[in-house]
Amino acid sequence: MDKLLINGGKALHGEVVISGAKNAALPIMAASLLASDHVTISNVPHLKDITTMMELLGQLGAHLIVDEKMNVQVDSSQVNEFVAPYDLVKTMRASILVLGPMLARFGKADVSLPGGCAIGTRPVDLHLKALRAMGADITVKNGYINARCKKGCLQGKRLMFDTVTVTGTENVLMAAVLAEGITTIKNAAREPEVVDLANFLIQMGAKIRGAGTSTIEVEGVESLNGGTYSVMSDRIEAGTYLAAGALTRGQVTVKKVRPDTLLSQLCKFEEAGAELTIGEDWVSLNMHNKRPQAVNISTAPYPAFATDMQAQFMAMNSVAEGSSTIIETIFENRFMHVQELQRMGANIQLNGNTAIVHGVEKLTGAPVMATDLRASASLILAGLVAEGETVVERIYHVDRGYERIEEKLSLLGADIKRVSDR
């Protein structure tokens, strides 16, 4: 099993090109099942979750061609299987995203209940409730969601999510584009990745209004065409590298980004004392060798501060000047990195969904274990600033969401390498 060896204490300097967003690429790849012709998706990151989605689409009968630049061509005209098996779905929660497209286009889908990061309860009940309201007959038995269309096709409805759900919004959005009539989704997720999916669907012929707001309206069409689409850049990867620059007191520029999707993070970096310069598709952060100031964080759905950046900011606050409060409102079990940061000398107290972080002068390298995707990123960041060697175990988690993270950090001056126990 691979692990990362990090010798910390070096300020990071330089530029890093940000990859395509995993959380946009996965639903877009799932949406290719809706098209009557082949689609070509570019700027797809080379990640384990992406490979899993490719395997899943292939299992369903889609034909995929991938070139050396990770341009992915999907032809779903020959789809002849309607079961998303446990062996694939268990490793990736986003596998649930094939449910809406399969149900809308083929009228049936059997999807194993999803897996992914062990960061608490992320039920699919909201997805199923909405699809049932649109006319689907759904049962859950032996670990599988068995969905069928009662009337041959889904019916447009007025839907209201009880809580904001990104994958739920995406699943229903994809189902609605081929439904009969108009579907209105209230309390819809506003994340940029939802907008990216909507733009992809619109390019293929879908009729969608309001993506990026809390109310999305979809007028169903008979079929979708093929097309070509470039996935948006990864705002969480961008924020992670900016955080690496901030906590090492360095200067880092992230390129090929959309600054408008980073506003909640950028405000907090400025509050921490960073000097920011923002261009059309890049952001430069410069700490001028200053220790960051502690910043308070409260996670919430977009456009508020992203839960996927909480762990990285906790690493920064661990070595910041002053004390901070971090409140996690999205997931109930997303502080699993705290115990590992404490092994490195971080001063953190937990009380329910709140962490109190007292910044210390330095962290000390230690063997630590990644427990989920973003927790692994926080441990790597902590290793970059710690004195001595940090060994991060179970980095298959980080490989699910960061493309070549050790190579990109090395280009910024980090002393980091991947080694294998094999």
Swiss-Prot record:
Its EC number is 2.5.1.7. GO terms for biological process: cell division; cell wall organization; peptidoglycan biosynthetic process; regulation of cell shape; UDP-N-acetylgalactosamine biosynthetic process. It catalyses: phosphoenolpyruvate + UDP-N-acetyl-alpha-D-glucosamine = UDP-N-acetyl-3-O-(1-carboxyvinyl)-alpha-D-glucosamine + phosphate. Its main location: cytoplasm. The keyword Transferase applies. Phosphoenolpyruvate binds at K22, N23. The active site is at C117 (proton donor). Gene3D superfamilies: Enolpyruvate transferase domain. UDP-N-acetyl-alpha-D-glucosamine binds at R93, R122, P123, V124, D125, L126, D308, I330. InterPro entries: Enolpyruvate_Tfrase_dom, Enolpyruvate_Tfrase_sf, MurA_subfamily, RNA3'P_cycl/enolpyr_Trfase_a/b, UDP_GlcNAc_COvinyl_MurA. It holds the Pfam family EPSP_synthase. It comes from the Bacteria. HAMAP family: MurA (MF_00111). NCBIfam families: murA, PRK09369.1. Belongs to the EPSP synthase family. MurA subfamily. This is UDP-N-acetylglucosamine 1-carboxyvinyltransferase. It comes from Legionella pneumophila subsp. pneumophila (strain Philadelphia 1 / ATCC 33152 / DSM 7513). The gene is murA.
